[in-house]
Amino acid sequence: MNVFLSKYVNGVDKKSRVSVPANYRAVLGKELFNGVIAYPSIRNNCIEACGISHIEKLKQMIETLDPYSEERDAFETMIFGEAVQLSFDGDGRVILPQSLMKHAGIEEQACFVGKGVIFEIWQPQNFEKHLKSAQKIAHEQRFTLRNAN
């Protein structure tokens, strides 16, 4: 399966290492790079992570914007300028940069949340707050998916 699913909470050690869930690594294993691309989310106070193929799709979408527009500059700066390639160690862990941990408020635990083509890494309590909001919105908008053909 090529989809990031489920939610996992893993500990972050004193060296900022965290284990990426095995099924996420299996999805990423189909990529050319043995690791993950991570960048600060522009939607939430979390880290977004994906494989190189998704970064290529983002690049194609951003390239459709006017090359001199503020929007394109902002997307290129926030996604490509802030992105880091995190390699897996022998135990399936990555080292989270302090800048990304600070952006997401991550200290001792990280909550991995599958979002289909990407996954997010949250501070667990912040994700629980976000989940409550998402549940409300999903319930209110549940009929939207009916017409999503």
From Swiss-Prot:
Its main location: cytoplasm. The gene is mraZ. Gene3D superfamilies: Transcriptional regulator MraZ domain (3.40.1550.20). One of its GO terms (biological process) is negative regulation of DNA-templated transcription initiation. This is Transcriptional regulator MraZ. The keyword Transmembrane helix does not apply. Keywords: Cytoplasm, DNA-binding, Repeat, Transcription, Transcription regulation. GO terms for cellular component: cytoplasm; nucleoid. Pfam families: MraZ. It comes from Rickettsia akari (strain Hartford). SUPFAM superfamilies: AbrB/MazE/MraZ-like. CDD domains: MraZ_C (cd16321), MraZ_N (cd16320). Forms oligomers. Belongs to the MraZ family. Residues 7-54, 83-126 form the SpoVT-AbrB domain. It is found in: Cytoplasm, Nucleoid. GO terms for molecular function: DNA-binding transcription factor activity; transcription cis-regulatory region binding.
